[in-house]
Amino acid sequence: MNNTKSPKNVSLKNQLELWLFCALIGAVAGALVWILLKIMAVGTEFLWKWLPGKTSFPYYTILICVAGAAIIGIFRKIFGDYPEDLETVMEKVRTEKRYEYKNMLVMMVAALLPLLIGSSVGPEAGLTGIIVGLCYWAGDNLKFAKQNTRNYSQIGAAVSMSVLFHAPLFGIFEVEETSEEDLAALTKGSKLFIYGIALAAGTGIYASLSALFGAGLSGFPSFDMVEIQRKDYLLMILYILCGLILAYFYQATHKLTGNISNKFPAVVKEIFAGLCLGITGSFLPVLMFSGEEQMGTLMKTYTSYLPLALIAIAFFKLLLTNLCIQFGLKGGHFFPVIFAGVCMGYGMAMLICGPDGGHVVFGAAIVTASLLGGIMKKPLTVTMLLFLCFPVKMFIWIFIAAAVGSKLITLKPEQEPSANYSKQ
């Protein structure tokens, strides 16, 4: 009796294994995103609301930021320069053909600590490293997963970003516009189908956990539908220019703060960043944290700000974000950059058109798209990221602004410097 399996049956079995494992990766990614955001929400509530309500310690913000920064510095000195951002993680996957997964708990702790003390960074850094690390662990320990490890790692990273930002297509475009190749041997249609399976699983797990135990980070709020007037289209060039100025400022300060941070020894640099963060937060609390909750507040109270104050906040937010990233209070830059773009858009629109809601929303959308385009060089990714944040009718204008921004800003920030942290 011939026990040889037909090529068709083997192919079907491999395809089913691929689909099932991608669904599992998506589910794990969704669960990890929820866990990170829930711990962050509980920790932030304790440190910044419950504890201050029980004590009346002077200079509380400075104390928490400096003490937390010192802990982060010591942690990084012992365990290494974590967390790593998406670009660094995927670059290691491309060049080294693997990603080290032995430090996943360290990555999670390193991602959480800066967020808890109010660092001006987002939560995405660290998540992708954990997901990709899990995929390579599976490749090393599960026979059927070995040949598709790189595919799994890219899909896992894409799903985690999409679930985190509540933007279904953002993750796949972020990974695709980053990678030099497609998802290995997969065809375009198959790739999107597999990503859809993983995303459905990830979103389902995240939504289920949020419904059962409460959500963590709520994500950026959505702007209401507004009427776009002829004046807004005429002002598009000005808004794009403002976004380009912010993008250039972000890249220049990224390089400057990186060069300055190299002159500081380990731990001292983190303490310095914590001191700057604490002093800034004592006078301008809106500059602390990643910016998603602050943006929700800003949407309701922007008329209480002077336009020039909002413009100044945009520049200070980018400067503080780069200071935190380069001096060791590391995290992602997407949330703070979006907040800065919205502040600049609001400020410019209010200067020219007054506080009318339609004008300021359009200004915020175009400035933010141009800013992100200039920093990321990925107009499709920018469009997918902002798609659920701004009204659908602005979709084409957001893409145009992001495309212009990605072409006109040529200053490229240097690779983020790493301090000489000794691993003991």
Question: Model-found features: residue ranges?
Answer:
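Alpha-helical transmembrane segments and immediately membrane-proximal extracytoplasmic
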Residues: M1-Q424
